[in-house]
Amino acid sequence: MKLAIVIGCLWIAPVMAMNVAFLNYGKKEEAYWHSASRAMQAAAADLGIKLEVSYAERKQQRMLAAAQALAARPAGKRPDYVIFSNDFALGAELLPILDGAGIKTFMAFSGRGSDQDIGLPRQRYRHWLGSLDPDAEQGGYLTTKALIQQARARRPDAGKYELLAIGGDPVTPSSVRRSDGMRRAAREAKDVELVSEVYAAWDQARAQQQAGWLFQRHPAPDMLWAGNDLMAFGAMQAWAECCVARGQPPLIGTINTSDQALQALAEGRLAALAGGHFMTGAMALVMLYDHAHGKDFADLGMEQVLPVFMLFDARSAGRFMQRFKGADFSSINFRRYSRVLNPALKQYSFAFGPLLR
């Protein structure tokens, strides 16, 4: 009788939900970081995860303060896992804070930089489990290749094509890799010259200023590549203010799936757009769900880089805006990506393109 009571109590006992905190480096009103958080919330709902999101508003001290606040909580109130992006190489300061509190950590969106002296996951910082990076180099490469193809079609007899570039920053690993992809595409095209490259810290106003200077020095560029949509819009504003009388604006390519960027692509104001990487945090939750349920991702590599980017056209942009209106990603079944819930899965497949078919 006592055994039956014990078994019954175990059966009806509530399962303790995973508690995950996401330290979002971006601004709450930024379309990209808002979409990233919304996708994570949809994944958390599917997987029974309690998700806590805080925004650093692109301020490094706020990011560090948020980590310190989590670490200072009583042991029973701390999250099981913390996800953060290694923007501006902040991981070197975040890891000691969180690891010292015994909190498991995971880098998403931007992992360890090749020149960062933080060691490898699970070594110096033993609670740092790993990272998931979108293949940022792929995003830069795809958009620049598309620009080059369109520049050749627009001026087939030019012989030489000028490319300008506005990157995010020279420190954040994902920013560096996006620019690497842009440069690789330019190098492969023997008829393209990258005539100037600047940084605008992902900021629209700063990009507008930088682009204005670029257009003074290079009055008739064929193409302009920007590391994110906000900087692309800044470049568009700069051209509209200074250079409309010169004739055709440069073909502009960028990265991110904000409504404004997708609409600009559909209207032809953007020539090239890649995206899908905002899903990285949601997929990180899938990996951590599996880790918590006994299926460690380490067999696939602790630092994973996945080709999640897709190149959009007007049709796929329209489909995206229709299916995910209002950044509502609840129609995605995130449980299907879990190796715990789908034992036949041998590896993770997080490509974004199939979601629009």
Report the location of each language-model feature:
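Extracytoplasmic "Venus flytrap"
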Residues: N19-A39, A43-A44, L51-A66, F84-A89, ...
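Hydrophobic alpha-helical segments within soluble ligand-binding/sensing domains
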Residues: M63, G130-K160, A207, T257, ...
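Structural motif
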Residues: E52-P79, S196-R217
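Flexible loop/hinge segments that line or gate small-molecule binding clefts
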Residues: I97-Q138, A261-L262
